[in-house]
């Protein structure tokens, strides 16, 4: 499942890697109203796709695409990824072999750091999603060389939205991505809800996917950095409010103030502040979701992962 938006320069490498991987796959690209020839490229290559008339956001596009397919496992990919041979088979084997797993994540490497033919030389993009003590999402191992610890299969808090394999049943039971997020932190929110519902996730290093890092997002905006800052600030607050313990509030306030200082240095103070105000305005909804989640499961299923990398 591949959402795209003005990704005509990115999709060929991904589609070629899926074709050459030796797997029988049902590929579907959901195009978010591209204007750069993406849909024409998909037609020329006979790639199954949904052509949406406008950009409805990453989260909504993924929901539309997954609803249009029927496979028991869904492999979600960003348009700026390349899949190494054997990756899908390795992920599927682990997920199919453990009914307690809701999803698995490959070893995601930085595409700009090296050639896809030489994974040993690349830096990590993600060895699994983790949460800081104050509930911010981080990618384990991001930017690091591949030490032995990143070459072992292990349980992780959650899966990175750039590349994951999930059970369709879990995705449907959770109601899919929260479309109000639009983009950014929608994967964090899904992981939070899955954990509270009793699901688990694993990191499978034998499976390798290369990721260019926000290239598929940047292609569609004149000022991608500012929009990124607004959405991340907004959606982080909305997500933290669903599970974070009250004892973490002083830490969160300190971190958020620090983020404003960094945003000012980067010329993104206005966008970051707008995002924070929007996140605060959403608090009644987020707290209502927190109460609902607490009735359905255990918030400690998320909290015990705070600060665990």
Spell out what each predicted region is.
Residues 17, 31-40, 54:
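A conserved acidic beta->alpha catalytic loop
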Residues 16-24:
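Short, acidic, metal-binding catalytic loop of nucleotide-sugar glycosyltransferases
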Residues 52-69, 79, 90:
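Glycine-rich, basic loop-to-helix element that forms the pyrophosphate-binding segment
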Residues 74:
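Short aromatic/hydrophobic "clamp" motif used to bind/position activated sugar donors
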Residues 246-309:
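Non-catalytic, C-terminal membrane-associated alpha-helical segments of glycosyltransferases
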Residues 85-125, 129-132, 136:
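Conserved donor NDP-sugar-binding/catalytic core segment of glycosyltransferases
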């Amino acid at each position: 499942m591949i959402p795209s938006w003005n990704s005509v320069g990115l999709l060929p490498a991904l589609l070629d890697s899926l074709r050459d991987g030796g797997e029988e796959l049902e590929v579907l690209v959901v195009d978010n109203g591209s204007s750069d020839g993406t849909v024409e490229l998909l037609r020329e290559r006979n790639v199954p796709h949904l052509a949406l008339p406008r950009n409805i956001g990453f989260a909504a596009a993924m929901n539309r695409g997954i609803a249009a397919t029927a496979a028991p496992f869904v492999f979600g990919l960003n348009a700026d990824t390349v899949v190494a041979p054997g990756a899908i088979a390795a992920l599927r084997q682990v997920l199919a072999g453990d009914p307690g797993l809701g999803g698995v994540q490959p070893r995601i490497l930085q595409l700009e750091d090296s050639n896809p033919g030489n994974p040993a030389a690349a830096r990590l993009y993600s060895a699994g999603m983790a949460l800081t003590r104050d509930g911010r999402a981080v990618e384990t191992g991001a930017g690091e060389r591949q030490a032995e610890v990143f070459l072992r299969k292990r349980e992780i808090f959650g899966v990175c939205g750039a590349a994951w394999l999930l059970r369709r049943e879990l995705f449907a039971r959770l109601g899919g991505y929260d479309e109000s997020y639009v983009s950014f932190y929608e994967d964090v929110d899904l992981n939070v809800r899955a954990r509270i519902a009793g699901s688990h996730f694993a990191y499978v290093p034998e499976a390798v996917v290369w990721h260019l890092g926000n290239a598929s997002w940047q292609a569609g905006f004149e000022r991608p950095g500012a929009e990124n800052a607004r959405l991340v600030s907004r959606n982080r607050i909305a997500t933290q409010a669903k599970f974070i313990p009250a004892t973490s509030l002083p830490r969160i306030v300190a971190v958020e103030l620090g983020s404003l200082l960094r945003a000012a240095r980067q010329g993104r103070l206005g966008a970051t502040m707008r995002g924070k105000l929007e996140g605060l305005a959403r608090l009644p909804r987020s707290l209502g979701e927190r109460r609902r989640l607490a009735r359905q499961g255990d918030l400690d299923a998320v909290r015990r992962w705070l600060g665990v990398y």
